[in-house]
Structure formats: structure tokens, C-alpha cells
Amino acid sequence: MSDILDTLRQEGVDPALLTAVQEYRAAHPLSEALRPRIPAPAFTYYGKEVWEQALAAILCGENLLLAGGKATGRNVLAENLAAAFGRPAWDISFHVNMDAASLIGMDTFAGGQVVFRPGPVYRCAQCGGFGVLDEINMAKNEALAVLHAV
């Protein structure tokens, strides 16, 4: 993970932003059980201005909407951001049948009892992770309403 920050230093990304990312990671340690969910990006996203805008937005507590054509690096950037912050990531692919229960979770029967089975958005929020919402343009209003509440 520090290699991503080293790469960003070499790319000339604002050192104050990189220091803030390191401080964030130190202030928000991750349990060992979640470490395998931290992405190990196969590719590095390059683009100093995009990195600086994305880092600043996340450090300010904002969400990002990465828009663009096919093969423009949106998922690569999202994976790199999660790795840079040292946070687990959940890839959530939307489709026309996606509903609120698929995202947040639902009750299910297990071991003779009704138990709550958390969905990916619930787990992501609970663990302070990055939710990579793919094909969000396919989402129904019901699913989008859940995201507005998160």
C-alpha cells in the first residue's frame, strides 16, 4: 500500500494530501479479518489532477461519482483509492432486478432461526470500506433511494 503512495509522490501529487491519507490510515486501523479485502491493484492509475481531486474529496468526507466511457479507468482508480487509504472494498454490480434488500440486507432462515444477512452496502458502511458501484445507471429508484440514505 505504501508503494501506491510512493508512486503518487513520484507523480507529484500534493504532499499535504498524501500526509493526510497517511494520517487517516493511522487514525482508522483495520482489523486483520478485513485486510484481505484491501485491493492489490494490478494496474496503477496515473493522472495527478484526478488523484488530487479524488483524495481531497474523500478526505473531506464526500463520495465520488466516476463517469466516463468504457475502459477509461474508473474501476482502476476506485481500486487504487481503496488501496491508498488502506480500506476494504466491495464491488457491487447493479442490474435491473437489484432492490434495497439486495444492497442493505435481508432476513433469512439459518439454523432454525430468522437471522439478518447483511448486504454489501451494509457491510461496506459497517467496516468503513469503499463501495464500488458498477453500472449504477441500471439501478431502479428503490435501490437509488437506499444509496441516498447512506
Label for each model-derived stretch:
Residues 1-150:
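AAA+ P-loop NTPase catalytic core and its hallmark functional loops
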